[in-house]
Regions:
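Transmembrane alpha-helical segments of integral membrane proteins
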Residues: 185, 417-422
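Short, charged juxtamembrane terminal tails flanking transmembrane helices
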Residues: 3, 461-464
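Membrane-embedded alpha-helical segments in integral membrane proteins
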Residues: 30, 34-38, 91-97, 147-163, ...
């Protein structure tokens, strides 16, 4: 059976739709709370920064699970990892469905996140190992499109359910998906590949990333203790990186980062993902907090720009094959900076149609950045390091999303608290806070443009 699967035979093709459904479920669960943060903050009487742990905490656990997935696939096999992922999605959704308070809701989200980390890594590994080489790129693009579809559909569906049925009902959807996947997978999914052994060390990732995103989220509200926590998080992550370099069988092999071309390419991917995921949270907060829209309408306004991002991902891959990274990625960051600047100007008026259009421009720019930067970064390495580099990329995407979300929502939350304490109306405080976050985002996009120009120019000169 192994030979047949590696040749991309009927058995592998029969299992691919089920695994793509796993990718959809993972991405749907990942972004389902982006639209619900204001309601959660109001319901439980917590700040936006605290409510945002439903997103940032999710990313921390997902990043750890991605790093852990390679070990589990070797040790337990695909079928067992599939059941662990589905079980985590079902258990986490069940906890959140009946959560009586914020902390039980957060616990449910953290359990859900195990599913996202395991599925993202497992599906990519399955495609890389079992697709016919001539079809591998198509299958990877199909998986990326499935993930993008989940991210685009989730805000609309979640907003509709949240508006019509309330917060508890929101978690019935991923629970039903998990049960359906478990039932189908029990009969359809077959084991793939030999099993092995290895060591695992995820605790330092959880502690380091947790401290890092907490410090970023609170530093604008309570600077001194938050800076101490932030420094502790950086120190723990540094210890984790050192351990991965000296361990015989590391949880995450970081040696590809010794290649400067790969490291800078990954930096561009992370900067792009910080902007992309943060927009997916900040725009609903603006629509709901500053303009008073329902969660459903906020999700519907976000869906078009996110779909534009998914389409530009595909276009970006084709343009990369034709042109290379120059001038594609610098143009992408330029579009992103332009779109963010127009969003900031239009939001203060407010000019809703222009905000939506400009956010679509920013998302299109990000689509021209992330996938081409990832492909270019991987191409700087020998094939023997592709698997390790792919794990690094997947983990870094979750880390960047957590850092970006924590930073921007932390700024917005601090501004809303400060504004309302000065007597500003809640909507005006949200408007001012959103403008502040856009200024920071524009600065990051401009700095990213400069880095991408230097990187693309260097690669172009090397190729002659």
């Amino acid at each position: 059976m192994r030979a047949t699967l590696e040749a991309g035979g009927k058995e592998a093709r029969a299992q691919l739709p089920l695994l793509l459904a796993c990718s959809f479920a993972a991405s749907f669960a990942q972004s389902m709370m982006n639209i619900a943060l204001p309601q959660v903050a109001d319901e439980f009487g917590v700040t936006l920064s605290t409510a945002n742990w439903l997103v940032t905490g999710y990313m921390v656990v997902a990043a750890t699970s991605i790093a852990l997935a390679a070990f589990l696939l070797r040790r337990l096999g695909l079928r067992t990892v599939f059941f662990i992922g589905c079980g985590a999605l079902a258990l986490g959704s069940g906890l959140a469905l009946f959560a009586p308070n914020f902390w039980v809701l957060l616990a449910g989200r953290l359990v859900q996140a195990v599913c996202t980390g395991l599925f993202y890594s497992a599906v990519t590994s399955f495609i890389m190992a079992n697709s016919d080489p001539a079809r591998r790129g198509t299958h990877l693009a199909l998986n990326s499109g499935t993930v993008a579809a989940g991210l685009a559909v989730s805000p609309v569906v979640s907003g509709l359910v949240l508006t019509g049925f309330g917060r508890h009902a929101l978690f019935a959807l991923p629970l039903a998906l998990a049960v359906l996947l478990l039932a189908v997978g029990f009969f359809r999914l077959r084991e793939v590949g030999p099993r092995g052994t290895g060591a695992v060390d995820p605790l330092s990732v959880v502690l380091g990333l947790g401290a890092l995103v907490y410090g970023l989220g609170e530093v604008f509200r309570d600077p001194l203790p938050s800076l101490a926590v932030l420094a502790a998080g950086v120190a723990v992550l540094g210890l984790f990186a050192w351990r991965q370099l000296v361990l015989k069988d590391p949880l995450l092999n970081l040696r590809p980062l010794g290649n400067l071309g790969f490291a800078v390419g990954e930096l561009l991917v992370m900067l792009g993902m910080m902007a992309s995921f943060s927009l997916s949270i900040l725009l609903p907060l603006y629509y709901e907090g500053a303009l008073g829209f329902s969660a459903f309408l906020a999700g519907a306004l976000l869906a078009g720009p996110v779909l534009a991002n998914a389409l530009s991902d595909v276009v970006g891959g084709r343009l990369l094959d034709r042109w290379g990274i120059w001038p594609l990625v610098p143009c992408g960051f330029a579009l992103t900076a332009l779109g963010l600047a127009v969003v900031a100007l239009a939001a203060g008026r407010p000019l809703l149609a222009l905000v939506v259009l400009a956010s679509a421009v920013a998302y299109v720019g990000l689509g021209l950045v992330v996938a081409p930067s990832k492909t270019t970064a991987l191409s700087q390495l020998p094939p023997s390091l592709y698997a390790h580099a792919s794990s690094i990329n997947s983990a870094f995407i979750q880390i960047a999303s957590a850092i970006g979300s924590s930073l921007f929502v932390g700024v917005l939350s601090a501004d809303v608290l400060a504004g309302t304490s000065r007597g500003l109306a809640r909507a005006a405080a949200y408007d001012a806070g959103f403008a502040h976050t856009m200024e920071i985002a524009i600065g990051i996009a401009a700095a990213s443009l400069l880095v991408s120009l230097a990187y693309a120019y260097r690669l172009r000169r090397r190729r002659g």
